[in-house]
Amino acid sequence: MDFHIRNSNLQEIEVRRKPHSRSPKIQQTEAEATAMNFRIPATASSIPTKYQTVFIPTSEKNGFNSRSLRFSYSLTQNENPGPGAYNVARTSADINSVSLSKKGTGGFPSKAPRTLQCKIARTPAPNAYNVYEEFFSKKDFSKGNSSMFQQPIAMEVEDTNHLTPAPNQYSASLTYCHPNNNVSAHAAFVSKTKRELLKPNPVKGPSPCHYKINDSLVKESTKVPVSCFKSKTSRNSLNVISDNPGPASYDPYKSSESEKKIIFLRKHYLCFSAPAMPIPKAPPVPGPGHYDIVDYEGLPKQYMSGAAFVSNTSRWAGDVSGKSLPGPGAYHPEIPGRYSFLYNSNRKWVPA
């Protein structure tokens, strides 16, 4: 049977009662208690009992031959007032009021109360709470180990920035690697349209090196004030790549190379063992002096009507300037003479 008591030094002492007998087992227990620094009363109690009281102190073990506590307070003490310190009795304020005379009241006493009627809140009493020990901020630092016998508080945290999974740790989903058509029914007229989401054949598209990325949408714009009428002319002329030949590619004074004629050998001309004929080279590209540039504005406009009932009469008079028309000296006017005709037997008019 174990219970706790409190002595005059406000130290909690655990008390155990054992059967009071002098058997060899009890004597062995007393010897063990003496070895464990238990306090056993020297004199037996005057009242005959069946139990023997043994005091087990809860003091700290000797550390570096020092028994004194580092802090004098005890954890069993509570700084808050106890439940009996509160006056929660419902007493009337008029009985202990200072404004009332001890000899009584007059003939016409006022019935108005001199004090405000404070309503007592229906709250639980202080002893109705059951506070757990984990909420107390007190800690007995007297029984704690020194810093040299315990691990440091600040532990080294493992660096997890470079702990990335390996490529073989991923589980690739195989749901999209095969057709998703799980229909087991088979109709009489089966449609040949594929139901797969992904195409089985790879897309024959250009490789990434065939793209020309426009950097105008990626580059950040300057954070300087810009005019509302901003010029759209590109100032970056270095990125303009032209496929035309450079200025030094032409030689205007060089004679044009004549095409070399293929000379067929007479010996192997009509044989299957004739040598392969060389492929003729491409003719040279014409230079700047080979062109005859003419200001060509295109065909003249033909103004056509777009109404529903279009007239067939031509509205285009042709060359209005008259450059292609013959001049006055281009005509040879002749006076037409008189002709006579005879009607022959074949019923045709023949000039006479």
Curated annotation (Swiss-Prot):
The protein's role, per its UniProt record: May positively contribute to the induction of apoptosis triggered by O(6)-methylguanine.
Species: Xenopus laevis (African clawed frog)
Pfam families: SHIPPO-rpt
Per-repeat ranges for STPGR: 80-90, 124-139, 165-171, 205-235, 244-263, 286-295, 325-335
GO biological process, one term: epigenetic programing of male pronucleus
UniProt keyword annotation of Repeat present: yes
Lineage: Eukaryota, Metazoa, Chordata, Craniata, Vertebrata
Name of the gene: stpg1
Family membership: Belongs to the STPG1 family.
Localization, UniProt: Cytoplasm; Nucleus
Keyword vocabulary terms for this entry: Apoptosis, Cytoplasm, Nucleus, Repeat
The keyword Nucleotide-binding is annotated on this UniProt entry: no
UniProt-recorded name of the protein: O(6)-methylguanine-induced apoptosis 2
GO cellular component terms, semicolon-separated: cytoplasm; female pronucleus; germinal vesicle; male pronucleus
A single MF term (Gene Ontology): histone binding
